[in-house]
């Protein structure tokens, strides 16, 4: 085994030093990357077990732990090692540590993963410590940790090398632990509410369920062009038709070949559900119960900070029809406007640039997005959307231009979208044909009518409420993350060459 003079014989380059140490270790101990190591407990379990141990007390208990070296002091006499659950201090001294283990100390660098067996004690200063009797090299790290282990300052590097970001940034580590807790919480909530989870195709021969640009691929064996799904909606509705369950949900990825921003990633996570014999008001109640449950699980309260804002997920949320919201902010009364031409004229008179072929509903939705969204800071349900932009929703009784649809907003972000689902097969076909014609007019020639879905609707779908929630944006709010890339473990990015 190497002695304390080893460092003097090694290169001055940090990476080369580690490579030379690895070579020496291979010569002296053989396997530097063993297949298995048995630890008796995690660092967090150790801390819990000895929480009541008084300062300056040494036990007779021998434990085995493992983790990555994050700091080393006094030539390795004191080391802090971290596992996923926390850290523990390691003490090595000739009075307690075997000669072979002490000889290994000069070969250990920050970032190496080691296993330690020793006696548990608490120092005079109150630090829980293991007096190392045996130290084993489990993984030799060939690269130094970044910036003296205080985290990555380069934002793009954090996304490109997420493993280093989490290794060196406790906030990032906590955020992804919370993400896991939130996704598990959504699944548990839905199951406890009687919903059955299913998995629908990610590769689809006909894309639908939303208006978005898809990713296209080709199946060689089937000789078939296919698309990564933009939404699972049509398959989930077919599941509802099947009678498998009256309450169905899915948590999975959607893909949209569109722009990247602080709120948009081409690959994102959605929770989508359908509830037979319910309507959009039932879905509002479900959203409020779910959001409140998640806030309590992460923060212990329904109120929490996002940036400089104090948000509350305590229901009931504000509910406002879209025409009323637009009238309140802009003064334009869309319910008093009767034609598409009048709607375009009113929008232009108010200073909005609208397209010459836009409908009444498209003008209303555009002005809402331009002027109203930014005012919706606390959780709010915006209801009564235009039918023009909502082909799968039931009409509002007495107002055929509007449908029973809502979107949930918070911090001016859309978090959820829900309908009283259209189940009239003739009306569904008429709207989908109209939507297809509009898509073809925009140049989307590959867009097709999903006859298999329409066939299922002909079979008879029960009245139902449907809901989609953007899981990534919800996690952003609950974890105080300014960008969607902060909550996606490996977000979309340009190649390193770019």
UniProtKB/Swiss-Prot annotation:
Mg(2+) 1 binds at residues 407, 414. It catalyses: tRNA(Lys) + L-lysine + ATP = L-lysyl-tRNA(Lys) + AMP + diphosphate. The keyword Transport does not apply. PROSITE patterns: AA_TRNA_LIGASE_II. InterPro entries: Aa-tRNA-synt_II, aa-tRNA-synth_II, aa-tRNA-synth_II/BPL/LPL, Lys-tRNA-ligase_II, Lys-tRNA-ligase_II_N, Lys-tRNA-synth_II_C, NA-bd_OB-fold, NA-bd_OB_tRNA. Its EC number is 6.1.1.6. HAMAP family: Lys_tRNA_synth_class2. NCBIfam families: lysS_bact (TIGR00499), PRK00484.1 (NF001756). This is Lysine--tRNA ligase. It comes from Rhizobium etli (strain ATCC 51251 / DSM 11541 / JCM 21823 / NBRC 15573 / CFN 42).
């Amino acid at each position: 085994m190497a002695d304390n003079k080893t460092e003097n014989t090694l290169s001055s380059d940090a990476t080369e030093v580690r490579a030379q140490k690895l070579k020496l270790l291979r010569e002296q101990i053989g396997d530097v990357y063993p297949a298995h190591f048995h630890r008796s407990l995690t660092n967090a379990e150790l801390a819990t077990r000895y929480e009541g141990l008084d300062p300056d007390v040494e036990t007779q208990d021998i434990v085995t732990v493992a983790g990555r070296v994050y700091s080393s002091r006094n030539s390795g006499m004191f080391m802090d090692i971290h596992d996923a659950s926390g850290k523990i201090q390691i003490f090595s001294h000739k009075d307690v540590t075997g000669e072979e283990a002490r000889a290994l100390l000069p070969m250990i660098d920050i970032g190496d993963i080691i296993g330690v067996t020793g006696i548990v004690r608490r120092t005079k200063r109150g630090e829980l410590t293991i007096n190392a009797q045996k130290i084993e090299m489990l993984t030799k790290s060939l690269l130094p940790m970044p910036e003296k282990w205080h985290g990555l300052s380069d934002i793009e590097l954090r996304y490109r090398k997420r493993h280093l970001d989490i290794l060196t940034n406790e906030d990032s580590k906590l955020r992804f632990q919370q993400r896991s807790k939130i996704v598990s919480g959504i699944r548990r909530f839905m199951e406890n509410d009687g919903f059955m989870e299913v998995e629908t195709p990610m590769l689809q021969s006909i894309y639908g369920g939303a208006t978005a640009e898809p990713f296209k691929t080709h199946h060689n064996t089937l000789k078939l062009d296919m698309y990564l799904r933009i939404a699972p909606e049509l398959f989930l509705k077919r599941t509802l038709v099947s009678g498998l369950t009256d309450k169905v949900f899915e948590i999975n990825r959607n893909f949209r070949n569109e722009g990247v921003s602080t709120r948009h990633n081409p690959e994102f996570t959605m929770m989508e559900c359908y509830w037979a014999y319910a309507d959009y008001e039932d879905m509002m109640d479900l959203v409020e119960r779910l959001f409140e449950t998640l806030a309590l699980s992460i923060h212990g309260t329904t109120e929490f900070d996002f940036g400089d804002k104090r948000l509350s997920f305590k229901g009931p949320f504000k509910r406002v029809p879209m025409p009323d919201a637009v009238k309140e902010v802009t003064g334009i009364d869309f319910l008093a406007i009767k034609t598409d031409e009048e709607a375009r004229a009113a929008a232009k008179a108010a200073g909005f640039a609208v397209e010459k072929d836009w409908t009444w509903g498209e003008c209303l939705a555009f002005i809402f997005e331009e002027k109203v969204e930014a005012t919706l800071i606390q959780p709010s349900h915006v209801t009564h959307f235009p039918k023009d932009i909502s082909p799968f929703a039931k009409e509002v009784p007495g107002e055929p231009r509007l449908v029973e649809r809502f979107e949930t907003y918070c911090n001016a972000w859309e978090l959820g979208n829900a309908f009283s689902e259209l189940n009239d097969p003739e009306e569904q076909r008429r709207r989908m044909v109209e939507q297809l014609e509009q898509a073809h007019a925009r140049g989307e020639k590959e867009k097709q009518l999903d006859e298999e879905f329409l066939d299922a609707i002909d079979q008879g779908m029960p009245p139902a409420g449907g809901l989609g929630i953007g899981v990534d944006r919800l996690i952003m709010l609950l974890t105080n993350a300014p960008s969607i890339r902060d909550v996606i473990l490996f977000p979309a990015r340009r190649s390193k060459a770019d």
